[in-house]
A protein has these predicted regions:
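C-terminal segment of classical bacterial N-terminal signal peptides
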Residues: 15-26
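Exported/periplasmic ABC-transporter solute-binding proteins
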Residues: 28-152
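Classic N-terminal secretory signal peptides
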Residues: 7-17
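N-terminal secretory signal peptides that target proteins for export/translocation
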Residues: 1-7
Length: 152
């Protein structure tokens, strides 16, 4: 009986490890990222290319014409690496290198930083031109989802 319990425990541990390992759909299902804006921004939807242009400093306005205020997250929580990986298929080191070159050459400055999803929502809900990204389950009625990164 002890042997059976031990075997069942090991199998369960293996299943959980595999199910929640990076790269599996179960691991990321709870953290699907969405791009959000202020509901008063006049933006209904945006493409990946439009969002990329704003977060990489190539576009300065939202499709509605309002000056864009992109809100990035610090690298601490993992959402930032996931966002850039899903949006432009780049590692965070590559994105940081890109911004270092632009800053050094005086051609741009990176998006404003927020510590976590709650802070992103606070900033976006209080600024008409703000755009950010959060896990789907963090988005609430104070913001509008304009792009679901998991569905494209």
């Amino acid at each position: 009986m002890k042997n059976l319990i031990s075997i069942v425990g090991k199998i369960l541990a293996l299943i959980l490890t595999l199910a929640y390992s990076p790269g599996t759909s179960l691991a990321y299902a709870a953290t699907d990222l969405v791009v959000i804006v202020n509901p008063a921004s006049g933006v209904e939807k945006m493409s990946r290319d439009e969002v990329t242009a704003i977060f990489m400093g190539r576009a300065k306005r939202l499709p509605s014409g309002i000056t864009a205020l992109p809100i990035d997250q610090t690298a601490n929580g993992g959402d930032k690496a996931k966002f850039y990986g899903e949006l432009i298929n780049k590692e965070l080191a590559e994105v940081n290198s890109y911004w270092a070159r632009l800053i050094f050459s005086g051609q741009g400055s990176p998006p404003r930083q927020a510590d976590n999803a709650a802070e992103v929502i606070e900033i976006v809900s209080g600024n008409k031109g703000a755009i950010g990204y959060v896990p789907r389950n963090s988005a609430d009625k104070r913001v509008k989802i304009i792009l679901d990164l998991s569905s494209q």
